[in-house]
UniProtKB/Swiss-Prot annotation:
Binding site for Zn(2+): 216, 287, 304
Organism: Stigmatella aurantiaca (strain DW4/3-1)
Keyword annotations of the record: Cobalt, Lyase, Metal-binding, NAD, Nucleotide-binding, Zinc
Name the UniProt record assigns to this protein: 2-epi-valiolone synthase
Reactions mediated catalytically: D-sedoheptulose 7-phosphate = 2-epi-valiolone + phosphate
Positions of NAD(+) binding: 105-108, 137-141, 161-162, 174, 183, 201-204
PANTHER family in the record: 3-DEHYDROQUINATE SYNTHASE
Family designation: Belongs to the sugar phosphate cyclases superfamily. EVS family.
Cofactor: binding details: Binds 1 divalent metal cation per subunit. Co(2+) is the preferred cofactor.
Molecular function terms, GO-annotated: 3-dehydroquinate synthase activity; metal ion binding; nucleotide binding
EC top class named in words: lyase
Co-factor requirement: NAD(+); Co(2+); Zn(2+)
Region (Disordered): 1-21
EC number, as in UniProt: 4.2.3.155
């Protein structure tokens, strides 16, 4: 151990996707420790990537010296894709096991994480085993959380099969579970070793789940992605899904440029602050109100995207009331959200409890209620605070304007 100077100590496996260094500076009375971590991984986007999963995994497995895999999926996605994914991974020579959990937001819980820890222990999973999250945003969040906490961190791969997972949940390294008092209150940052996004998987989703993910794409458009809003306006939304067998194909074709654009914008915004230490985050557009709705209804009345859509409409109306957004812009946003079959109004019976959630957020953020508000179709700003009167007026304005925009 050095007594003076600064000594870097490199991670022992510099070939790993997760590299780091530690530097010491000090002497007999103590040390200053500086730790740097570097994570490197690829996000592979394209139709047919699921069929190439084994090929895509080989370099990841080699870098981690991984020798086995555990797929974690849910009872909706598993019957569709678990067999294919198992075959593709088995082709690499790695033994594969599969764990199936109940689908839906209630599985994103510490209780479910505990059950998965128990399963991994019972299956003698070691640090050279990698996990595969096969599913939507809930699976990606949950499996990432289990991966970072089990044995102090094992590798994992996100194979996102839902639009919400593809444009949001699988991207950025945020992992965690919900608490009974709020969404995503338990978790951290732990990047995957690979993200695989095959838009063809969207054809097997219920239309409601596709719509759920579209809300996040609208959010990304509004915070500053020129042209994305217009692409969303042109999306073909069939009322006959899935009876109209061509409808999923048309929608997937329309989403072709939207998925990488949404991912790219999210990563661009995360680049200067990947661990989100700054509370002023444009990516929170619609989420303050949205999380309030989800918590108030115990995560069962609204899908995440539906809650974000209502939150987006509400803060846009607040922005209109403040003179930051034109009524025409508000109407255009309401028109798109409703075209995508997303809800836009805070129900009367939930207005009070959502406001109380915002008040709680104010306490957590040192007395400041930070809200992201659109000022134009591709530009948003962050406002430091609003009043109860402004919130109530916005709820009324959305309720008033929405019928004519539907």
């Amino acid at each position: 151990m050095p007594s003076t100077g600064s000594t870097p100590i490199l991670a022992h496996d510099v070939k790993s996707p997760h590299r780091g260094s530690l530097a010491l500076d000090g002497g007999k009375t103590g040390y200053r420790v500086t730790v740097h971590r570097e994570d490197r991984y690829e996000i592979i986007i394209g139709r047919g990537t699921l069929a190439r999963l084994g090929e895509l995994l080989r370099p990841v497995m080699a870098a981690n010296e991984a020798d086995s895999a555990v797929i974690i999926t849910d009872n909706h996605v598993g019957p569709l894709y678990a067999e294919l994914v198992t075959k593709r991974i088995s082709a690499t020579g790695a033994p594969v096991q599969c764990i199936v959990i109940p689908a839906g937001e209630p599985s994103k819980s510490i209780a479910q994480a505990h059950r998965l820890w128990d399963e991994l222990r019972s299956r003698s999973v070691r640090r050279r085993t990698f996990l595969v999250a096969l599913g939507g945003g809930v699976l990606c969040d949950l499996v990432g959380f289990v991966a970072t906490t089990y044995l102090r961190g094992i590798p994992y791969v996100n194979v996102a099969t839902s639009l919400m997972g593809q444009v949001d949940g699988a991207i950025g390294g945020k992992v965690g579970v919900d608490h009974s008092t709020g969404k995503n209150l338990i978790g951290g940052f732990y990047h995957p070793d690979l993200v695989v996004i095959d838009p063809s998987c969207l054809a097997t989703l219920p239309l409601a789940e596709v719509i759920n993910g579209l809300a996040e794409a609208v959010k990304v458009a509004l915070i500053g992605t020129p042209g994305l809003f217009e692409q969303l306006e042109r999306l073909p939304m069939s009322t006959a899904w899935p009876l109209d067998q061509a409808a999923p194909e048309r929608l997937i074709e329309g989403l072709g440029p939207i998925i990488p654009a949404a991912i790219g914008k999210k990563l661009e915004l995360l680049a200067p602050d990947p661990f989100e230490q700054d509370l002023r985050r444009l990516l929170n557009l619609g989420h303050s109100v949205g999380h309030g709705l989800e918590a108030a209804t115990h995560f069962v009345r609204y899908r995440h995207g539906e809650a974000v859509a209502i939150g987006t409409a509400t803060v846009t109306a607040i922005s209109t009331g403040l003179g930051l957004t034109s009524v025409d812009t508000l109407r255009r946003i309401l028109r798109l959200l409703q075209k995508l079959r997303l809800p836009v109004t805070v129900p009367d019976d939930l207005r009070e409890v959502v406001w109380q959630h915002l008040e709680t957020a104010r306490l957590v953020r040192n007395g400041r209620l930070l809200l992201v508000m659109p000022t134009a179709i591709d530009h948003s700003v962050i406002i430091d605070d609003i009043t109860r009167g402004q919130y109530d007026a916005a709820c009324q304005l959305v309720a008033q304007e929405a019928p004519a925009c539907g």
